[in-house]
Amino acid sequence: MKIIRGIHNIKEINSNSVVTIGNFDGIHLGHQKLFSHIYQIGQKYKLSTIVVLFEPQPLEFLRKNNAPVRITKFREKIRRISSYNFDSILCVKFNKSFQSLSAKDFIINILINKLHLKFIVIGNDFRFGFQRNGNINLLKKLGYKYQFNVIKIRPLYKNNIKISSTNIRKALSENNIKLASLLLGRVFSISGRVIHGNKIGRTMNYPTANILLSKNFLLTNGVYAVKIKYCPNKYAIGISNIGIKPSFSNTQKNKLLEVYLFDIKIDLYGKYIEIFIYKKIRDEQFFPSKKELKNQISQDILIVQKYFNIHKN
C-alpha cells in the first residue's frame, strides 16, 4: 500500500479506481462498512482502491482551536486504514488554496484525471469542496457525464443512536466509554510515545508510563481501568490517571496520561504504546500528602482488579 502525501505527489495510476473521501475520524463502524464496500468493488471489477483523506481535517484548518477534538490521531488513522490492504491512501493537505477549490474542479482534475475514477463510495451526509457545495447530487450529475458510479452508504445505528464521529465525541466527553466503544466497534483507545515523567509514582512503588495529551482531550480528568498493548500481541492490565496531577503540580497545562501496570515490570520509555480505556473509576482528586494518595491508589487498584476479574472477556 502506498501513502501519497499531497496531490502533487500523485504518480501515474495505470488502472481505473474506486475511491472514497472523508475525515474518517475514529474509523468507526460506519467507516468500516464503507471500507468493506470499497474493497469488495475493487476485487470484483479489478480496480485500484484509494482512500482520500484530509490533513489537517477541514474544521481544524477553519476553526483552529475551536475545531472538534480528534478521536484518532493521524498515525493511528493511517494504521487502521492500512489494515484493509487498499492500494493507496491519498493525504490531501487542506490549506487556503485547497479550500478555494470547487467541488466540480476537484472531481474532474483530481478524481477523474489523476485517479481515473470509476466508482466513488460515500457516506450519507457527505459534502465537500468550496463552501461544501459538493454533494450526492453533484456526484451523480458528473457521474452520468464522465461515466463513473456513485454509491451512497446508509448510516448505521446502535441502540437507536446514529454511528457518527460526533456522537462518539459526545459519548466520550460524557464519560460514556461503553457507548463510544459500541459505536466504534472496538474498545476506545489512544496511542502515544512514552515520555519521562517526574518519577513521583516510583517513590510510592507505583512507577508509571506517561503519555502527553492535548489540554482538550475528550475524556474528563480521572482514574480509569485500562489495558495497554506494549508489543505486538502483548497486553497488560493497569490503572491510569488522566489529568494534571493536582497533588504535585499547579503549573501543568496539558493533560497527562499516567498508567501503572499490574504484575509486570518493563521499561517503556520511548516506546509507542496503545492504551485501551474501559471504565472510569473516579474523578481526579487533590491529596495533601503522598501517604493519602498512596492509600487511595491501593483502593483504586483493587477496584480495577475486581472490574477485570468480572469482565474477563
UniProtKB/Swiss-Prot annotation:
Classification via Gene3D superfamilies: HUPs, Riboflavin kinase-like
Domain of life: Bacteria
GO biological process: FAD biosynthetic process; FMN biosynthetic process; riboflavin biosynthetic process
Biological pathway: Cofactor biosynthesis; FAD biosynthesis; FAD from FMN: step 1/1; Cofactor biosynthesis; FMN biosynthesis; FMN from riboflavin (ATP route): step 1/1
Enzyme Commission number, as recorded: 2.7.1.26, 2.7.7.2
Entries under SUPFAM superfamilies matching the protein: Nucleotidylyl transferase (SSF52374), Riboflavin kinase-like (SSF82114)
Protein's UniProt keywords contain Nucleotidyltransferase: yes
Residues in the signal sequence: none
Catalytic reaction(s) noted: riboflavin + ATP = FMN + ADP + H(+); FMN + ATP + H(+) = FAD + diphosphate
UniProt-listed InterPro entries: FAD_synthase, Riboflavin_kinase, Riboflavin_kinase_bac, Riboflavin_kinase_bac/euk, Riboflavin_kinase_dom_sf, Rossmann-like_a/b/a_fold
Molecular function GO labels: ATP binding; FMN adenylyltransferase activity; riboflavin kinase activity
PANTHER family to which the protein is assigned, alphabetical: RIBOFLAVIN KINASE, RIBOFLAVIN KINASE/FMN ADENYLYLTRANSFERASE
Family recorded in the similarity comment: Belongs to the RibF family.
Protein name: Bifunctional riboflavin kinase/FMN adenylyltransferase
Gene this chain is encoded by: ribF
